[in-house]
């Protein structure tokens, strides 16, 4: 990694030395020749032969051979379920037999029925579908080899990123392809509504969980014991999504902790020696659900999963979606993560079968592990040329000359690589051809007309489609692809924003503003809790490396070359600042004292649409329900909005002075104070 001379005196804000920062944030360049296109062989070998191949996967050395029905029996007869049923019987005065019957019904609803025949069916069908719609499915072979070893040593938990319904099908397909055990997968109950398909998924390893348990202690006990039993037995790798649901905006969603808590428990209760956590990054050139996501972000309810809907979706088989990159990260030992941090002795004080309330220390540890896993996922997400192209287009909309687009995209390519972005760019093709092929792949969004690249703003002669403004649909699809870049740029961009918002150049003031921005946007982007100083140092280091700034003892100075870099970075992140300002203005205009979350979404959507229609704003990010939801969560956390529970629902009311102050701080009318992260 090159060290610019200006970075040598960077980091006197904290105790971390410059050398340590360089080591901390230098990212090993990934070698593309180590990636294998698994579809290459599929195109030359019969799909039927592939589906019917001899499948003898490597298994965990401590495996307890059992059938799916044996797991159910083991759960029902476990000490933990017996204990919980007895306790609930005392509390509710219901007979033990009734509660046991309920536990049986819960298990029947959730449990998988893993069968080799179903796996072979999916192998055959998915091979045909993937060859039809994807050019390549590229996998890092080294990651597969490490996973092969890990599966034999200890129970394994697979933690993939989640951008599409294809994610879990793709992983099962790949593990079957490499003769690894197909995972058991935590899936939402939505799929059970799909006739035949739901049962097929169950037979291919899916087990089903309700979105909310609603305080149902028996359901939680049965579900957690079911997952722990599979993990302890080494039955198969357990797979779930830390994000809990698909990200519609292509940004990583903040993690959910429930399942992570469950899979850690056998280790802390000394039921297994160790557990491997494997972060997996799945990247798409073009997302299958791109249009559906734009509709959902504009407030159109998600269509219910159904077999009919699946059959209607067959039209995607006539479209092309480019490449998929699947990066299997290094298996992370839970034992190593806990060493020196979390002792197992508290679990020795009571019998294993008695559920324990989670300690504050344990909650902090689980939270930290979840964020670390997500940061590993983010580090290995692959960028295609398209997010770079669309980022340039959005800052020059509605159209740009092709040569100007080419020049700006190549400049951004250099900056992305300098910032450690994991970028795939065909080096054997001229840059013009790379950009033209990207435009062709996304011809539903952009077109090349007479040497100008134009965003599509109309559908035929109409500006409306399904009651929505077509321009809004196009822009939200573009914003989702641009969002793929934000992971690479978030820290240097927030330093750039802080430099713009801070009067003067004092490093201490810039850091204070950076912390404020991290606090406000911690629902938008993934930051390791308590890591603000290191995040600031990384942002400064990358800006020094690109020669955009010089960090002196007390001040941060912008170089002559740095203006173009900072201008681009600010343009990338300013929409989030402006969106939150607009939502502050809506809250200050809110006439009702109290409102529900549903009312908030309806009213904020109406308010923002009017602003855009009137030309009072060009910030289309604010239309996204994802941004609106994250802003509300941030405002509650910062004390700008108060949240109360009334009759099983939450109501909100606005703290006007705090809202005014936040709006002024975001708009640079009021300097960010110290400490910046305190409640407003």
Curated annotation (Swiss-Prot):
The short motif Microbody targeting signal is annotated over 678-680
PTM sites of type Phosphoserine: 12, 17
| GO CC field | peroxisomal membrane
Bilayer topology annotation: Peripheral membrane protein
Q: Which Pfam families match?
A: Acyltransferase, GPAT_C
Pathway(s) this gene product operates in, as recorded in its UniProt entry: Membrane lipid metabolism; glycerophospholipid metabolism
Q: Which GO terms describe its biological process?
A: ether lipid biosynthetic process; glycerophospholipid metabolic process
EC nos? 2.3.1.42
Catalyses which reaction(s) = dihydroxyacetone phosphate + an acyl-CoA = a 1-acylglycerone 3-phosphate + CoA; dihydroxyacetone phosphate + hexadecanoyl-CoA = 1-hexadecanoylglycerone 3-phosphate + CoA
| Residue positions where N6-acetyllysine is found in the record | 643
Q: Which UniProt keywords apply?
A: Acetylation, Acyltransferase, Membrane, Peroxisome, Phosphoprotein, Transferase
Motif mapping: HXXXXD motif? 162-167
Does the record carry Membrane as a key word?
yes
In terms of CDD domains, this protein maps to:
LPLAT_DHAPAT-like
- Select a single GO molecular function from the record's annotations and give it: glycerone-phosphate O-acyltransferase activity
Compartments it resides in: Peroxisome membrane
Q: How does it assemble?
A: Part of a heterotrimeric complex composed of GNPAT, AGPS and a modified form of GNPAT.
Job description of the protein? Dihydroxyacetonephosphate acyltransferase catalyzing the first step in the biosynthesis of plasmalogens, a subset of phospholipids that differ from other glycerolipids by having an alkyl chain attached through a vinyl ether linkage at the sn-1 position of the glycerol backbone, and which unique physical properties have an impact on various aspects of cell signaling and membrane biology.
User: Would you tell me the protein name for this molecule?
Assistant: Dihydroxyacetone phosphate acyltransferase
């Amino acid at each position: 990694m090159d060290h610019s001379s200006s970075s040598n005196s960077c980091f006197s804000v904290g105790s971390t030395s410059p050398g340590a920062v360089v080591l901390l944030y230098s990212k090993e360049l990934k070698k593309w020749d180590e990636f294998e296109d698994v579809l290459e062989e599929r195109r030359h070998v019969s799909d039927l032969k592939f589906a019917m191949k001899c499948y003898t996967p490597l298994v965990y050395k401590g495996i307890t051979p059992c059938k799916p029905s044996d797991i159910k029996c083991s759960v029902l007869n476990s000490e933990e379920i017996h204990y919980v049923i007895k306790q609930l019987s005392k509390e509710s005065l219901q007979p033990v037999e009734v509660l046991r019957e309920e536990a049986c019904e819960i298990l029947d609803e959730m449990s998988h029925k893993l069968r080799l025949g179903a796996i072979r069916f999916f192998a055959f069908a998915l091979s045909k579908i993937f060859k039809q719609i994807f050019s390549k499915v590229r996998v890092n072979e080294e990651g597969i080899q490490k996973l092969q070893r890990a599966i034999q040593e200890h129970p394994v938990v697979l933690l993939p990123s989640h951008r599409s319904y294809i994610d879990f099908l793709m992983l099962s397909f790949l593990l079957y392809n490499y003769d690894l055990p197909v995972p058991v997968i935590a899936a939402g109950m939505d799929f059970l509504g799909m006739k035949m398909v739901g049962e097929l998924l169950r037979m291919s390893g899916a087990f089903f969980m309700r979105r909310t348990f609603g305080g149902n202690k028996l359901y939680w006990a049965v579900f957690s014991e079911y997952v722990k039993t599979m993990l302890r037995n080494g039955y198969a790798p357990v797979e779930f999504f830390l994000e809990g649901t698909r990200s519609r905006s292509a940004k990583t969603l903040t993690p959910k902790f429930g399942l992570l808590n469950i899979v850690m428990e056998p280790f802390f209760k000394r039921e297994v020696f160790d557990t491997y956590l494997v972060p997996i990054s799945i990247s798409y050139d073009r997302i299958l659900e791109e249009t559906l996501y734009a509709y959902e972000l504009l407030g159109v309810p998600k269509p219910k999963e159904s077999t009919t809907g699946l059959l209607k979706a067959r039209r995607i088989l006539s479209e092309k979606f480019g490449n998929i990159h699947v990066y299997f990260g290094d298996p992370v030992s839970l034992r190593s993560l806990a060493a020196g941090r979390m002792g197992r002795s508290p679990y020795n004080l009571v019998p294993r079968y008695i559920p324990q309330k989670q300690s504050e220390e344990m909650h902090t540890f689980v939270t930290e592990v979840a964020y670390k896993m997500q940061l590993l996922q983010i580090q290995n997400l692959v960028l295609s040329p398209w997010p770079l192209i669309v980022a340039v287009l959005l800052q020059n909309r509605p159209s740009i000359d092709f040569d100007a687009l080419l020049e700006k995209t190549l400049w951004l390519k250099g900056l992305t690589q300098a910032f450690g972005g994991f970028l795939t760019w065909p080096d054997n093709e001229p840059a013009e051809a790379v950009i033209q092929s990207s435009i062709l792949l996304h011809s539903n969004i952009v077109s090349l007309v007479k040497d100008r690249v134009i965003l599509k703003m109309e559908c035929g002669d109409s500006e409306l489609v399904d009651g929505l403004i077509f321009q809004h649909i196009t822009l939200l699809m573009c914003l989702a692809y641009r969002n793929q870049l934000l992971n690479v740029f978030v820290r240097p961009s927030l330093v750039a924003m802080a430099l713009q918002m801070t009067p003067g150049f004092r490093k201490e003031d810039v850091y204070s503003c950076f912390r404020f921005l991290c606090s406000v946007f911690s629902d938008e982007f993934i930051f390791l809790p308590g890591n603000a100083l290191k995040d600031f140092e990384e942002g400064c280091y990358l800006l020094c490396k690109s020669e955009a700034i010089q960090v002196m003892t007390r001040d941060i100075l912008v170089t002559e070359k740095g203006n173009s870099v900072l201008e681009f970075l600010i343009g990338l992140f300013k929409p989030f600042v402006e969106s939150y300002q607009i939502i502050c203005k809506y809250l200050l205009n809110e006439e009702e004292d109290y409102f529900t979350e549903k009312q908030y979404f309806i009213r904020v959507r109406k308010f923002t649409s009017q602003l855009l229609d009137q030309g009072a704003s060009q910030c289309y990010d604010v239309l996204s329900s994802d941004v609106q939801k994250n802003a509300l969560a941030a405002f509650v956390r910062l004390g700008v909005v108060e949240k109360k529970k009334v009759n099983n629902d939450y109501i909100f009311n606005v703290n006007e002075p705090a809202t005014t102050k936040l709006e002024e701080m975001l708009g640079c009318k009021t300097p960010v104070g110290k400490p910046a992260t305190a409640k407003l």
